[in-house]
Amino acid sequence: MAGGSFGPTGVAKERAEQYQGKVTSYVIIACLVAAIGGSIFGYDIGISGGVTSMDEFLEEFFHTVYEKKKQAHESNYCKYDNQGLAAFTSSLYLAGLVSTLVASPITRNYGRRASIVCGGISFLIGSGLNAGAVNLAMLLAGRIMLGVGIGFGNQAVPLYLSEVAPTHLRGGLNMMFQLATTIGIFTANMVNYGTQQLKPWGWRLSLGLAAFPALLMTLGGYFLPETPNSLVERGLTERGRRVLVKLRGTENVNAELQDMVDASELANSIKHPFRNILQKRHRPQLVMAICMPMFQILTGINSILFYAPVLFQTMGFGGNASLYSSALTGAVLVLSTFISIGLVDRLGRRALLITGGIQMIICQVIVAVILGVKFGDNQELSKGYSVIVVIFICLFVVAFGWSWGPLGWTIPSEIFPLETRSAGQSITVAVNLLFTFIIAQAFLGLLCAFKFGIFLFFAGWVTVMTIFVYFLLPETKGVPIEEMTLLWSKHWFWKKVLPDATNLEDESKNVSV
């Protein structure tokens, strides 16, 4: 095996240039199948907003909201302010938050495929319950099962993509999860646009169609190859080598395999990964695992994607026009993700996050000004201003789609060493789902209270996160996943936080006892 110098964590420092291989059809197919999990996540994000704007659904389960919607004197910003309706959307993410804690040990001890299959089965059950719901309890039970699927899928799929992708294309291939998510959102918007014509049962079709990608995810999980990292970590080194040879299209995988073996030896010495991740030497990665998903949600994007039809109806768009406008934003999100895939491994992560953040701030401020000046509680926007609002919301979505959308998942999935990778991904998913739940539950109330100021609220957060990236996030482009820890010791701020190299070995031993 190829040699290399070692740091205190036991992982090779200078072996990356010896990695060989190419992008094989085996890698592409594996990534495509795995990324189906993202499409279901996106479908469930996009479908709820359209369904909750359908009169038949509201009359069946949320009659109070249905009556309020029909009252002309009700404030435009407060028509949909109902905690029960918000709970329909947010329950999905609360269930996902709990299930991701269960998914972490399964992903580590039984492999990434096991969690992908568990997620697919949960999605199947949830979509069936939602489609056949006859009361609110059955409806919420279906949403909870979908949330369990999200917890498993979002925990395993980004890890899977990071671990099968070649180092030089890891950013682009890992973004297939976000691309699949955006395709799922767009598909949900188009489905809602069609099913709202099918009265009174169109909403059932919207909710039930999630079963199709769930079936693909479940079946695909059985046939996917396990990642070589996971196999090596579980002691199946020779099997891991065979998979790595297929993935890289070359027999000369010694250098990359040796990095995995070195990392797995350290990983297997760690008995309590969640305790280990709290060590000072993992502080930079832990901060990123918390801040990146938190900031991703605080861009305000999920509020637009969850409630796009509701939001556009609030602005005076008719039922069909609001669904059409939300479908347009979904299409724009898909296209912008393609831009990110093409640029992320050339321009790097930091450039996309900073420029995307600036663009989002400008768009949100402009939308807030237009709504504040031209849109009142009981008025409607003129056609011209409505078009301008839709354009700037689309530009906001474009900025998110090539920056925080994919990179909010990519960066946390690639920065952790193997011994804390599964725990780190669990924290990332848990934080994402926690803040998604909070925003989903609070958004309709915030919209009623802040009115047009809701866009300024999110613009303020985007300003904070852009400054955070500029000062605290090092560039991870082209850095091998098993050598990522070296970045932090060279960063102007994090090198002050990390313990001395001589203390790292002792710290590692202490946590494994």
Curated annotation (Swiss-Prot):
<dbReference type="GO" id="GO:0042882">
    <property type="term" value="P:L-arabinose transmembrane transport"/>
</dbReference>
<keyword id="KW-0762">Sugar transport</keyword>
<keyword id="KW-0769">Symport</keyword>
<keyword id="KW-1003">Cell membrane</keyword>
<feature type="topological domain" description="Cytoplasmic">
    <location>
        <begin position="1"/>
        <end position="26"/>
    </location>
</feature>
<feature type="transmembrane region" description="Helical; Name=6">
    <location>
        <begin position="205"/>
        <end position="225"/>
    </location>
</feature>
<feature type="transmembrane region" description="Helical; Name=8">
    <location>
        <begin position="324"/>
        <end position="344"/>
    </location>
</feature>
<feature type="transmembrane region" description="Helical; Name=1">
    <location>
        <begin position="27"/>
        <end position="47"/>
    </location>
</feature>
<keyword id="KW-1133">Transmembrane helix</keyword>
<dbReference type="InterPro" id="IPR044778">
    <property type="entry name" value="MFS_STP/MST-like_plant"/>
</dbReference>
<dbReference type="GO" id="GO:0090406">
    <property type="term" value="C:pollen tube"/>
</dbReference>
<feature type="transmembrane region" description="Helical; Name=7">
    <location>
        <begin position="286"/>
        <end position="306"/>
    </location>
</feature>
<comment type="similarity">
    <text>Belongs to the major facilitator superfamily. Sugar transporter (TC 2.A.1.1) family.</text>
</comment>
<dbReference type="GO" id="GO:0042900">
    <property type="term" value="F:arabinose transmembrane transporter activity"/>
</dbReference>
<feature type="transmembrane region" description="Helical; Name=11">
    <location>
        <begin position="427"/>
        <end position="447"/>
    </location>
</feature>
<comment type="function">
    <text>Mediates an active uptake of hexoses, probably by sugar/hydrogen symport.</text>
</comment>
<dbReference type="InterPro" id="IPR036259">
    <property type="entry name" value="MFS_trans_sf"/>
</dbReference>
<feature type="transmembrane region" description="Helical; Name=3">
    <location>
        <begin position="121"/>
        <end position="141"/>
    </location>
</feature>
<dbReference type="GO" id="GO:0015293">
    <property type="term" value="F:symporter activity"/>
</dbReference>
<keyword id="KW-0472">Membrane</keyword>
<dbReference type="GO" id="GO:0005886">
    <property type="term" value="C:plasma membrane"/>
</dbReference>
<keyword id="KW-0813">Transport</keyword>
<keyword id="KW-0812">Transmembrane</keyword>
<feature type="transmembrane region" description="Helical; Name=2">
    <location>
        <begin position="84"/>
        <end position="104"/>
    </location>
</feature>
<dbReference type="InterPro" id="IPR005828">
    <property type="entry name" value="MFS_sugar_transport-like"/>
</dbReference>
<protein>
    <recommendedName>
        <fullName>Sugar transport protein 7</fullName>
    </recommendedName>
</protein>
<dbReference type="Pfam" id="PF00083">
    <property type="entry name" value="Sugar_tr"/>
</dbReference>
<feature type="transmembrane region" description="Helical; Name=10">
    <location>
        <begin position="387"/>
        <end position="407"/>
    </location>
</feature>
<dbReference type="GO" id="GO:0012505">
    <property type="term" value="C:endomembrane system"/>
</dbReference>
<feature type="transmembrane region" description="Helical; Name=9">
    <location>
        <begin position="351"/>
        <end position="371"/>
    </location>
</feature>
<dbReference type="InterPro" id="IPR045262">
    <property type="entry name" value="STP/PLT_plant"/>
</dbReference>
<feature type="transmembrane region" description="Helical; Name=4">
    <location>
        <begin position="144"/>
        <end position="164"/>
    </location>
</feature>
<dbReference type="InterPro" id="IPR005829">
    <property type="entry name" value="Sugar_transporter_CS"/>
</dbReference>
<feature type="transmembrane region" description="Helical; Name=5">
    <location>
        <begin position="171"/>
        <end position="191"/>
    </location>
</feature>
<dbReference type="InterPro" id="IPR003663">
    <property type="entry name" value="Sugar/inositol_transpt"/>
</dbReference>
<feature type="topological domain" description="Cytoplasmic">
    <location>
        <begin position="473"/>
        <end position="513"/>
    </location>
</feature>
<feature type="transmembrane region" description="Helical; Name=12">
    <location>
        <begin position="452"/>
        <end position="472"/>
    </location>
</feature>
<dbReference type="InterPro" id="IPR020846">
    <property type="entry name" value="MFS_dom"/>
</dbReference>
